[in-house]
Amino acid sequence: MDYKATLNLPQTNFQMKANLVNKEPEMLKFWEEKEIYKKTLETRANAPTYLLHDGPPYANGDIHLGTAMNKILKDFVTRYKTMRGYRVPFVPGWDTHGLPIEHRVTTSLGEEAKKKSPAEIRKLCKEFALKYVDIQREEFKRLGVKGDWEHPYITLDPDYEYHILDVFKTLVENGNVYRGNKPVYWCPTCRTALAEAEIEYHDHESPSIYVKFQMVDKPDTYIVIWTTTPWTIPANVAIALHPDYTYVKIKVDEEYWIVAEGLLQKFAADVGIDFEVVEKFVGKELEGKLTKHPLYDRTSVVVLADYVTLEDGTGCVHTAPGHGEEDYQTGLKYNLPVLSPVDDEGRFTKEAGKYEGLKIWDANKVIVEDLKNNGSLIKAGKISHSYPHCWRCKGPVMFRATPQWFISVDKNNLRGKVLEEIKKVKWYPAWGETRITAMVQERPDWTISRQRVWGVPIPAVKCKDCGEVTLEPKVIEHFANIVKEKGTDAWFELDVNELIPADFKCPACGSKNFEKTHDTLDVWIDSGCSWEAVIRSKGERFPVDLYLEGDDQHRGWFQSSIFLSTAKAGTAPFKAVVTHGFIKDEQGRKMSKSLGNVIDPMEIVNKYGADILRLWVASTDFFDNIRVGKNIIEQQVEVYRKLRNTLRYLLSNLYDFTEADLLPYEKLLPLDKWALGRLQKFIEQITQYYEGFEYSKVYNATVKYCTTELSAVYLDILKDRLYVEAKDSIYRRSAQTALHYILEALIKILAPIIPFTAEEAYQESHLKRYESVHLEYWPEVRKEFIDEALLEEFDHLLLIRDDVLKALENARASDIIGHSLDAHVIIEAKNEELKNLLRKYESLLEEFFIVSKVTLSENISGLNGQFANVLVQRAEGQKCQRCWKYHPDTGKDLEHPETCPRCSAVLRGERK
């Protein structure tokens, strides 16, 4: 007889083959049509709000793996918090002004860009940005990221621009904004000032030269400086010495050179000289001494500075206040002239004399040659070092003194207030606090003006009569109200008299004759105002619960946001900050087109599905740098298959089960009580990991639970009961009750990580209380399901089971058995406690070990296990053709001559 029809074989439409690439778009359509995101807010309208504020990516290209990972991590948070019962609005945003976009537009125009008016360039920039907003929006949605995609915040929207100006007005009112002629990072290619957050450091080869400056009062004595920027020597006005260092005068041939004693040996070895020390003195003894400039007929004065170090060079620092922040500060102290004879394109101006018209990088060679010819050059070489580059064009930048607008970070103790706010924030990982604190402590004033057109104009006006440049709160407010209606294009389209209040007069001379200025705001101010434009002004809870971005944002968005929020609102804009590292390839190298190791996230999605990409994100310890490559993604495909098969097993064995079939805990079999107890521990552990943003631990614990605890133990053991026992028997319903709770918890736990698969499983299950799993609530830990004594007992039984499995494997290798059901296992536990435990659970040991018979015995000679001695023999009796177990009484039932007594009872309907 074919007994297959008498078994409760698994049934489900949840296929083993995922086919995510085709199914996921259908799921997205389902979520959209059913308005699931909107319903998550409606069903939790009266619940506490949890706000993760989205840091806006630049709308200047397709998403890359880093932006994909960032949005997926945010989606883990918002989906989890929604299931925890919070109202979780998520408004995605885009950064749409600034150099990255303008650079792309002007580069594509080539020479045509110079023929375009500012208004025309701005129109093209807007079109470009909005095009990529739409492209990125669809890409993020395809990743399964939920949010208010139809109503994102976009920094070029007039309402958003209004709030930028409103925050800026507060800073001006507070006196934190000033105009100064001081050195700033300047990109000669992009022809604009840059802030610290717009600087990248790359290796760069520079000249390395030692130059001697002749003392005016002692023509045979020279102070030796070292520099890697010969092009700044035309702007030199001083030489800085440390006041407390010991300096030496050394005799070299017929000359005397002055260098720091602490660098003497290194210097002498580098330039290859023999010398004799003739005098020692401290730096402050030379203060005020004059030297002759090596290129021009003027003098350079000796000044003192604490920043002089003994790391490199000579301890005598070439000082050009027009080309360095520290030099500038020293210049203020000594009232030195600020020379910066370089124009916007990095060419020398007429103030540089013979070098006029030369680009600074080309001038290096010419200046070194001139120094050599006039006898001032001691040695010239090359040095490879980390040098600042523009974040957009990737070219080297310079420090250049130009009139710019700045935010003073110390006025009104703003820096001090920000440092206090930093302490109140929870940082993940904890070192984030140390990092941003150090950056804030050391940062200079914020250069906020840009010599570009694609941005929010700084509404400063210049008096045509006296030349005074004025930035007044009432002008900003007047312009902001215009912007609310017409956007910032108004600055480029309207007459200046329409942009200022009718009664506004020049504070310096009383004139009403003005012209517009043309600087725009640093784009970091745009995004740094998002807390006001998107959250606070809309009446949402403030400060928000979380900012989550790459760890480069400690000097970017986190810093701009906390400075602006502290200045305007008196508080940090966030309660917690989570940062992630950067993506590297499988060898740990940075991803770059030149290495050919860039991975497009949409290629992964289109080949494997978004859930595979999301699973990879969950697998990473994202607080550090993250590796990815083909092999790593393939590993996730295999892990996904295991998770999917676990879900499939659970679903396929609950096909005839409803909540009406649930058994009360006290009626469950011991093994099922153990499974439910372990489930509660798992839920408790996973919840802690989700709360701490430890998704790699969620991933590892879930994979381990599914593969080790479920598939390799519990689910394997259950097959006999599920398939063979009577459909409605307590044996099967007890198992199904446990599977019900496991499936329910597992689907919910996986929902934030792999939302498509979780939804598919939910829709195929008997669990549907809502339209979508993403409207469900997080599984609660049910303490009544935890029997600590029973859990401890099964921990010991599992250890004995390991010994049994080893013995079975040995027996299989020795051809004593083929399948474990061929076995009769004889066990001798190694201590009295374990012997008593085996006696207590003797009736379930055959099921637990998946064998036909278990005998507890003494003094056996089998496998010497760690916890038990185990002897494996071939089971006696005939093999039951229904359950495949061996039993001495198989075949004695005339009605069912091929079955064991248990199966005969099931077939007769006698085993309930």
Swiss-Prot record:
Cofactor(s) of this protein: Zn(2+)
Co-factor binding details: Binds 1 zinc ion per subunit.
Entry-linked InterPro entries: aa-tRNA-synth_I_CS (IPR001412), aa-tRNA-synth_Ia (IPR002300), Anticodon_Ile_BEm (IPR033708), Ile-tRNA-ligase (IPR002301), Ile-tRNA-ligase_type1 (IPR023585), Ile-tRNA_ligase (IPR050081), M/V/L/I-tRNA-synth_anticd-bd (IPR013155), Rossmann-like_a/b/a_fold (IPR014729)
Tagged with keyword Cytoplasm: yes
Entry note about domains: IleRS has two distinct active sites: one for aminoacylation and one for editing. The misactivated valine is translocated from the active site to the editing site, which sterically excludes the correctly activated isoleucine. The single editing site contains two valyl binding pockets, one specific for each substrate (Val-AMP or Val-tRNA(Ile)).
Protein name: Isoleucine--tRNA ligase
Organism the protein comes from: Fervidobacterium pennivorans (strain DSM 9078 / Ven5)
Entry binding sites for Zn(2+): 880, 883, 900, 903
Its job: Catalyzes the attachment of isoleucine to tRNA(Ile). As IleRS can inadvertently accommodate and process structurally similar amino acids such as valine, to avoid such errors it has two additional distinct tRNA(Ile)-dependent editing activities. One activity is designated as 'pretransfer' editing and involves the hydrolysis of activated Val-AMP. The other activity is designated 'posttransfer' editing and involves deacylation of mischarged Val-tRNA(Ile).
GO BP terms: isoleucyl-tRNA aminoacylation
Subunit structure: Monomer.
Motif ('HIGH' region): 57-67
Primary location recorded for the protein, binned into one broad class: cytoplasm
Subcellular location: Cytoplasm
Assigned GO CC terms: cytosol
Residues that hold ATP according to the record: 593
Residue positions binding L-isoleucyl-5'-AMP: 549
